[in-house]
Amino acid sequence: MSIRKLACLVLCLSFLLGASTGFAATKKYIVGIDGDYPPYSFIGADGKPTGFDVESVQWIAKEMGFEVEIVPTAWDGIIPALLANKIDMVYSGMTANEERKKVVDFSTVYWEIDQAIAVKNESTATMEDFNAGKLAIGTQRGCTAAEWLEDNLVKKGILPADKLRLYDNFPAAAMDLEIGRVDAAMMDDMVVIGTIKGKPLKIIGTVKTGEEYAVAIRKTDTDLKDLINEGLKRLMASPKWEELKAKYEMQK
């Protein structure tokens, strides 16, 4: 083979290798969210998922070079969906508690919250009434508020079991609060603030729980965990982080 033909062959191979690299499929991850969890994740007026967490993971995906598909998933089935490989991560205001850590892994913490209690504007209910078990309380099933109420009020005989009302999502609990089916509603503080905005409801107090939000990932997906951790690090160091906090009124 002549030197000219050999050079031509090398050039062609280089082009083909470069082309195959350039057209390599971008990795896509399925992100499970709660579709009724403002300001973290909810369905916008255009029918598309949005929120603080949704925009955060979309920014991270672009920054780190992968794609995401946002899939609203029932909260009480979201970890089973993760374990069954139906989704690749949960990025939707999930508390990284010890019970969940037994079955899934978590990213670095990106937010800290407490629990807030809301009542109707005209209500005279107080935190003393709440702590004494005098109020029928609504919250979302499978969430930290439900666990706290069960462990600290129901199991101790302070709150009758029939006064703890569980819902598929917190907006449903807030709706029943508005129409008087429950006396109070309890949930993560920023969720309560976001949900009652513009409604005839008010916050009467908080329960200090110091929960930490993180992204849930299967224990075997260590590469994805590293990818998300690096993405979170870059996001929280970028102007986008403060922009998102301002957009979704994340200052308590």
Which role does the model predict for each range below?
Residues 9-18:
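Bacterial N-terminal signal peptides
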Residues 25-93, 166, 240, 247:
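Extracytoplasmic small-molecule ligand-binding "clamshell" domains
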Residues 35, 112-121, 190-193, 197-233, ...:
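Periplasmic-binding protein-like
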Residues 36-38, 49-62, 116-160, 164-169, ...:
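Bilobed "Venus flytrap"/periplasmic-binding protein-like clamshell domains
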Residues 54-63, 122-144, 215-252:
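Extended ligand-binding regions for polar small-molecule ligands
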Residues 62, 67-131, 205-207:
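Acidic, polar ligand-binding/catalytic clefts
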Residues 67-70, 144-165, 200-206, 233-252:
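Ligand-binding clefts/hinges and TM-proximal coupling segments of bilobed small-molecule sensing domains
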Residues 77, 93-102, 150, 175-209:
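A ligand-binding cleft/hinge motif common to bilobed small-molecule-binding domains
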